[in-house]
């Protein structure tokens, strides 16, 4: 079995003094050799980290001793290598960003469905199955017959519901996401909008892949994950996808053979989305990454874009999305 344990966790709970948890949690992670990112907000905790079996157990034991953070349910998968470069504990307004005020999964939330009961639910012809993840995640794997809202970010999901779903028409709705957290808010939002029967997969796709045998699965493809593995297969081992470090899209080995693919600079998904100035920054970043690797060092540029580059990328992608919307309306 792979030696690195990758642990995804979250819990919605009132943490009025969440700021005071950042430093001791950061120290706990560092002392136990754990890397990855955890988010803290007044509404709870969320994130994915990785480390040894002993390190992850020590972190979970520490969390269990903190008021409100006991009994956190986590999902585990495995990797041969450490999938993160750094250790970060961040303070946020939300632990998963939907951008709708007043949505509180602690107060209102959909009906949880265990992985063992999920197949029966989504096989019901009266159930509308909705994938709440982003379009680039859905492209590499989803459940059979699932609806893809084709959102670029979770913030776009409420608009999708308003424009495409109707409580009077869609009587039963089942939803799923990677680990379950997005469905906590999406189901709460839909109930607030008047939908009566709203279900979601308890523990998300990761828990389903862990518990449901391959011969019974209704999952098709691989599951996108937000770390260096890019995707995991049904065995929760590293999948077949790589990632373009310019636009962060998952790419296949076949797509890497394209003339548009330049490692760290561009791929078939983003070849027309960046300026020459941005490409030059990507080229320099990739040069630094390769130089660090040749020295046996790590370079954080391989993990994330700088804050400025990320902001510019988001603006470029938003412009592209708006262009597609205009074209669709014109047609």
UniProtKB/Swiss-Prot annotation:
Query: Single Gene Ontology BP term?
Result: tRNA modification
Note the InterPro entries from the entry. Answer: Rhodanese-like_dom, Rhodanese-like_dom_sf, TrhO, TRHO_N
Asked whether the keyword Isomerase is assigned, the reply is no
User: Which EC main class describes this enzyme?
Assistant: oxidoreductase
Question: Which keywords has UniProt assigned to this entry?
Answer: Oxidoreductase, tRNA processing
SUPFAM superfamilies in the cross-refs: Rhodanese/Cell cycle control phosphatase
Q: Where is the active site?
A: 177 (cysteine persulfide intermediate)
Which GO terms of the molecular function aspect are on file?
oxidoreductase activity, acting on paired donors, with incorporation or reduction of molecular oxygen
Q: Which reaction does it catalyse?
A: uridine(34) in tRNA + AH2 + O2 = 5-hydroxyuridine(34) in tRNA + A + H2O
Which stretches make up the Rhodanese domain?
A: 123-217
Q: What is its EC number?
A: 1.14.-.-
Has keyword Oxidoreductase? yes
Which residue ranges run through the membrane? none
Q: Report the Pfam families cross-referenced here.
A: Rhodanese, UPF0176_N
Family to which this protein belongs:
Belongs to the TrhO family.
Chain's role? Catalyzes oxygen-dependent 5-hydroxyuridine (ho5U) modification at position 34 in tRNAs.
- Entry protein name: tRNA uridine(34) hydroxylase
